[in-house]
UniProtKB/Swiss-Prot annotation:
Encoding gene (name): ttr-16
Family: Belongs to the nematode transthyretin-like family.
Signal peptide positions (record): 1-19
InterPro entries from the UniProt entry: Transthyretin-like, Transthyretin-like_sf
Record organism: Caenorhabditis elegans
Record's subcellular location: Secreted
Name of the protein this chain belongs to: Transthyretin-like protein 16
Predominant subcellular localization, coarse grouping: secreted
Carbohydrate-modified residues: 23
Record carries keyword Glycosyltransferase: no
Record GO cellular component, one term: extracellular region
Keyword field: Glycoprotein, Secreted, Signal
């Protein structure tokens, strides 16, 4: 039993030693019906397989609808970042918000992903709606 614990500790240390710090910046402009949208929540997450996804950064769009989020994570494999954008552009019912998920391309890791205009009036695959 003791040797099993030692082996597990050594394996955990080996994984930690091979982890490397990776980062990404994502920027863009939130628009709804061709108008820039202020005060939209933009969250940058990093997908994990075995444990809950890591929230790396949260920002609100400014008065011009612009946002920029940055995150970094130590991982043994390539990070899998994505954005959750929560907004009230064309919900199906009053008092509801839409939550869209946007994947960050793998080739943008270590740099900046400029989404330019994020058209929130167009529904994205897997989008959710939350009503109060």
């Amino acid at each position: 039993m003791r040797s099993l614990v030692v082996c597990l500790l050594l394996a955990a240390c080996a994984l930690e030693c091979t982890a490397r710090l990776q980062n990404v910046t994502v920027k863009g402009v939130a628009v709804c019906n061709k108008k820039r949208l202020a005060n939209v929540e933009v969250q940058l997450y990093e997908k994990d397989t075995l444990d809950p996804d890591d929230l790396l950064d949260t920002k609100k769009t400014d008065a011009e609808g612009e946002f920029s989020v940055y995150g970094e994570e130590d991982e043994t494999h390539a990070i899998a970042p994505y954005l959750l954008i929560t907004h009230s552009c064309n919900p199906s019912k009053p008092n509801c918000v839409r939550i869209g998920r946007y994947l960050v391309p793998e080739d943008k890791i270590g740099g900046t992903y400029d989404m330019t205009y994020v058209t929130l009036d167009i529904k994205v695959h897997g989008e959710k709606e939350k009503c109060q």
